[in-house]
Design a protein with these regions (language model features):
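Beta-propeller blade termini and top-face loops
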Residues: 1-258
Length: 258
């Protein structure tokens, strides 16, 4: 009963729920039109995690728009796939709020990348590409080039022609899978920073090549333990990054490193 979109007007002291679908559906992605802060897009995702597994997708999933700062919402459907949907990722072009992209999980006949040139009133599918969305699924528009589109799911890819064709650069060789966040420098679009299950990677050539940043204390450990050696070793199992062990002491001033 606590799922949905919430709004605060006092810096987070109090919150009001402004969009609610049902107890099985929450908000998974949300963007604001940079040229009109009263225009908001919210992607709702029907998903439930249980002790024995999870269910994802259903008739609760959908894309909504508000033009009055969240007071009222309208579901956007024209041109989008009918029936049950799953994860939806959205982005608005910062230089023209009419241009919106949505990465939609649906059945084989409807999934893919959709484009709107009228603030979401109607949509057309420009690509069937949707790299296994899961709970992470992102689409990002280059803030200085509306034809440059990035997609992140399990895999990562980019397009220079508005989604007609795609390339990966050295992403397959040098990026960890499962991409959650992407930042594009608005002053230099060649500089992009990507967050994935493997940590943080950056590129200075528009995602053609990538550098991974090691030794950041951001790994998600599910369990840790110690062995019986002297000095004892500390071991941990990470999210999609294997298990690591290291001595609990080191003779370097930098501490224990990967």
């Amino acid at each position: 009963e606590e799922r949905g979109v919430y709004k605060t007007v006092d810096g987070g002291a109090k919150w009001e729920r402004v969009l609610y679908i049902d107890e099985h559906t929450g908000a998974i992605d949300m963007v604001m039109d940079p040229s009109d802060p009263n225009t908001l897009f919210a992607a709702m995702y029907q998903r439930e995690r249980k002790s024995f597994g999870f269910s994802a997708g259903g008739d609760g999933s959908g894309l909504y728009r508000s033009t009055d700062g969240g007071a009222t919402w309208t579901e956007l459907t024209e041109g989008l796939p009918a029936g049950d949907k799953g994860r939806i990722g959205i982005d608005v072009y910062r230089r023209d709020g009419n241009l919106v992209y949505a990465l939609v999980e649906s059945d084989q006949s409807g999934r893919g990348l959709y484009k709107s040139t009228n603030r979401g009133e109607s949509w057309e599918r420009v690509s069937t590409r949707n790299p296994r969305p899961m709970y992470f699924s992102l689409v990002r528009i280059d803030p200085n080039n509306p034809e440059r589109i990035y997609l992140g799911g399990v895999a990562f890819s980019a397009s220079d022609d508005g989604g007609k064709t795609w390339w990966q650069g050295d992403a397959a060789a040098n990026l960890h899978v499962d991409h959650h966040a992407l930042w594009i420098d608005p002053n230099n679009s060649d500089y992009v920073v990507l967050g994935s299950d493997g940590g943080i990677s950056s590129s200075w050539d528009g995602a053609q090549t990538w550098r991974h940043h090691n030794n950041l204390a951001i790994g998600q450990f599910y369990e840790i333990g110690v062995d019986m050696s002297e000095p004892y070793k500390v071991c941990g199992g990470l999210q999609d990054n294997s298990s690591w062990c290291a001595p609990n002491e080191t003779n370097t001033p930098y501490g224990v490193k990967n």
